[in-house]
Amino acid sequence: MIAVCIATYNQEAFIAQAIESVLMQVCDEAIRIYIGDDASTDGTSAICEAFAVQDERIQHIRRSVNMGLVSNTIELYRRIMADGCEYIAMLDGDDYWTDPRKLQKELDYLRTHPDTGFVHTAVEGQGDEPIPTGDLRDRYNLAGARHTNCTVLFRADLLRPNELDDIERQGFPVLDYPLYGLFAQRTRFAYLADPTAVWRDHSSVSQPSSRRARWHYRRERLRMWHWLDKKCPGHFHFRYDKAILWYIWHFFYILFA
């Protein structure tokens, strides 16, 4: 069973396209869609519920209070683990898949490479900034390699409840980097060059808009890299140093701009 994990909040303009892109998948493995609706206040909940009523593979889990992206996603992981799904595919509520065989291609790779637990692909960009390109390595390396979360498929047994608890306690602004950094200590990562998804990158969805919010976000990311550097000695020190330099530059930019 492949669990498709969709975390969403106030994305009524995008969520239907995201769900439909999963439903169009042609795959020889059963698919179940878990939608973590983080107490949306727009039309997102109604759209998700309409899909869930029509297709029993869709579980619409609407939070009674807003939990934030990290806790919302971790709660989905806990539910997926309890249901015994073997694989987890990630899809943010504002992105969508473009290749109807996206899951099948990634699944085939994992089946034929038992030493690999995580696969991601190229992506098409839609938004304010171009998709960064560069050296993408089989072994996850945050100093060089990049991933786009909407392309990721990984083995569910990589998840550890104690690690999820630890990350949640830290209160980081993002989940993918610290979690996948821990994954990299026990499995290989693979990159497939064919684009399979569209990633929307714009300020209203992907990043804080005010200077104060951006400052806080950068500071929290710096704390995240420091945590990873301690958890995985030798693997992320370069990335931590780079985050420090970026933090200093951003401080002076906000101070004098």
Q: Across the structure, where does each feature detected by a protein language model lie?
A:
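Cell-envelope/extracellular polymer assembly enzymes that use nucleotide-activated donors
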Residues: M1-A3, R32, P178
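Conserved short acidic donor-positioning loop in nucleotide-sugar-dependent glycosyltransferases
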Residues: N10, V22, D38-A39, M67
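Short, acidic, metal-binding catalytic loop of nucleotide-sugar glycosyltransferases
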Residues: E20-A30
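A conserved acidic beta->alpha catalytic loop
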Residues: D37-A46, V65, D92
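Glycine-rich, basic loop-to-helix element that forms the pyrophosphate-binding segment
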Residues: R63-D83, K105
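Short beta-strand-to-loop acidic/aromatic patch adjacent to the donor-nucleotide binding site
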Residues: C85-D94
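Conserved donor NDP-sugar-binding/catalytic core segment of glycosyltransferases
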Residues: P100-I131
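Conserved nucleotide-sugar donor-binding catalytic segment
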Residues: T121, P132-H216
